[in-house]
Amino acid sequence: MEDLAGFTGAGLNLTLPNVVGFDNLVAAITRVWASPFTARAFGWRQSHMTAPEHVYTSILLLESVASDKSGVLVTQDIDNGHSGVISVAVNEGLGGAVDGQAAESLRIDLETGAVRVLATATAPRRRVPDPEGGLIRLPSSGSDVVLQAAEIRQLIDFAQHLPDRFPPIVDDQGNPAPADVEFGFLDGDLRLFQLRPFLDSRMTGGIAYLHQMDASLRDSHKVRVNMEETPRTERRPRTC
């Protein structure tokens, strides 16, 4: 349900990083399971779906990786759509580029390896896993660059061989689409966390897409609801 035709729910539902301990994990599953039914999540779906109550939840459990740096890669130039260039945003620590921190932004030519720097990482702190659970913030290294040459070569190799290693990436119309990849580096080795069709630029727009969806809800406070009435739901034909 996170990615549907004309709708991306990236960042809409709850993600809990680095949950430590069995009891804490069970409690976290309950919170994540319920998150599609918060007023915020339900309201956004209601603006774009005819039956937003039809949500069939699944949860993905991933082992936490204490990445030295992490980011997002799109297999095209997000400014002009050129497929011979990859767009990369990366920060020190965990998840900074995904969550809108000021990231190192690069365009990397897949054929020549040439790198064009659009922005440098200026976030003063990086997020790292706390052994007791959750994340803590530590000072960033202050380095002028985040990605090193060897790491850039790994990203180029990954992007070049992606079509051979994974099923075709297509949009909701079945047409070829660029890949949106979340990655990290641990001790110089590339780690892949997520791969999906590229529907929206989280690197350039942050959560602008969700803010756009918010716009349709701005007048919702004017709607009056009779709490004694039975909620109206969409009627669907049933087969026996």
Go through the PLM ranges and name each one.
Residues 205-240:
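N-terminal, non-catalytic alpha-helical interaction modules of very large eukaryotic scaffold proteins
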Residues 1-215:
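Conserved mixed alpha/beta core segments that line enzyme active sites in large multi-domain catalysts
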